[in-house]
């Protein structure tokens, strides 16, 4: 059996990636989230496939087809809620995964980090298009507001928006293309995941100490397969609790009202995982400025490796940087809260302050702190 595992052309790849992979012996539970993201992707593809069998991408029947799935399809309600709450689990794992990369300096593995950011953008695009498909009020108006942001692009903006819509407003053409793209993107994401892992296995995993562990590695199986399996069980427990006991906890009640272009909801907001970016968008009173800030709020991660002059890779032994990291986390939580609030004082000023703090921390304060820490350590 060992010979087949190590010599068979296909099994050899799986063996070198999942069984005999040399792994640092000291990686903590925060390194579990990569495998959990893989599990989330598989759950989303399987549940999504079953939903696509019963869904119709037509403005007249989309809403009722989702109702039909929940009422008439065997366990359709469960598949629908697993898919909707699976997206929330996906983003929860994504944010922790990126946060761990920032805290432990994994961004020094440049190729892996950049492919990861492409993955983050792809997953966000997929989730946005998926939110449009049930064709409720928030689906329709969310699609209208977010796609309309592209009209802020000088000269080509209006044409670009109408090209994406397939008409002069969000219509049947928009819904059909969003469904097609929402269906194909997870498979493109799967290909990017393979590239992400390919780059990661070229350099090997980082570890909490940020030091080379080449002289001291252990095989991935059975140590980390067991550890990952425990994480997977906890993820499934949380997902099942959400889907079976609190299925609509993270959703919006407005989405249970069929889309009506003549009636605007009192407060348009995206799903919780986009609220931080939405708050940054709203905090700038200029349309183009808001769109630029929105894109930069994620794209800034790409320049993080060039903004960190620290001599120690991880924040484990750098208390000042640790303090600032947790301020950044608190700031993002504040932005998430603000994104769900109406556009009125004091929420406007809190959002603007939090947005300024977010960019200041990323571009100036954290790099400057790294330099101070280097001086203190006489490096």
From Swiss-Prot:
A ubiquinone binds at residue 201. Its main location: mitochondrion. It holds the Pfam family Cytochrome_B. GO terms for cellular component: mitochondrial inner membrane; respiratory chain complex III. Coiled coil: none annotated. Binds 2 heme b groups non-covalently. SUPFAM superfamilies: a domain/subunit of cytochrome bc1 complex (Ubiquinol-cytochrome c reductase), Transmembrane di-heme cytochromes. Heme b b562 binds at residues 83, 182. It is a multi-pass membrane protein. Component of the ubiquinol-cytochrome c reductase complex (complex III or cytochrome b-c1 complex) that is part of the mitochondrial respiratory chain. The b-c1 complex mediates electron transfer from ubiquinol to cytochrome c. Contributes to the generation of a proton gradient across the mitochondrial membrane that is then used for ATP synthesis. This is Cytochrome b. It comes from Lepilemur septentrionalis.
């Amino acid at each position: 059996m060992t010979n087949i595992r190590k010599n068979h052309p296909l099994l050899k790849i799986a063996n070198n990636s999942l069984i005999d992979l040399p792994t640092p012996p000291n990686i903590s539970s925060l390194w579990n989230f990569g495998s959990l993201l893989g599990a989330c992707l598989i759950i989303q593809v399987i549940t999504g496939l079953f939903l696509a069998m019963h869904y119709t991408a037509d403005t007249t029947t989309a809403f009722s087809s989702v109702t039909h799935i929940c009422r008439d399809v065997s366990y359709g309600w469960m598949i629908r809620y697993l898919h909707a709450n699976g997206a929330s689990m996906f983003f929860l794992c994504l944010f922790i995964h990126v946060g761990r990369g920032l805290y432990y300096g994994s961004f020094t593995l440049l190729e892996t980090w950049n492919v990861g950011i492409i993955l983050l953008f792809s997953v966000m695009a997929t989730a946005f298009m998926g939110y449009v498909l049930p064709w409720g009020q928030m689906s329709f108006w969310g699609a209208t507001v977010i796609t309309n942001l592209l009209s802020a692009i000088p000269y080509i903006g209006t044409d670009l928006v109408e090209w994406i819509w397939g008409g002069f407003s969000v219509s049947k053409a928009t819904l059909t293309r969003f469904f097609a793209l929402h269906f194909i993107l997870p498979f493109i994401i799967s290909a990017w995941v393979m590239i992400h892992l390919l780059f990661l296995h070229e350099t090997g995993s980082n570890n909490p100490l940020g030091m080379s562990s080449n002289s001291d590695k252990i095989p991935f199986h059975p140590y980390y397969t067991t550890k990952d399996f425990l994480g997977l069980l906890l993820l499934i427990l949380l997902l099942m609790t959400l889907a079976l006991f609190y299925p609509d906890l993270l959703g919006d009640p407005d989405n249970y009202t069929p889309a009506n272009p003549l009636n605007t909801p009192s407060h348009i907001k995206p799903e919780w995982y986009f609220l931080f970016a939405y708050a940054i968008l709203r905090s700038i009173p200029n349309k183009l400025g808001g769109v630029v800030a929105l894109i930069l709020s994620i794209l800034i991660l790409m320049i993080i490796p060039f903004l960190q002059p620290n001599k120690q890779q991880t924040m484990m032994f750098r208390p000042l940087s640790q303090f600032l990291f947790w301020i950044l986390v608190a700031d993002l939580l504040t932005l998430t809260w603000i994104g769900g609030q109406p556009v009125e004082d004091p929420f406007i000023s809190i959002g603007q302050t939090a947005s300024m703090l977010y960019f200041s921390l990323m571009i100036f304060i954290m790099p400057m702190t790294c330099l101070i820490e280097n001086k203190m350590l006489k490096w």
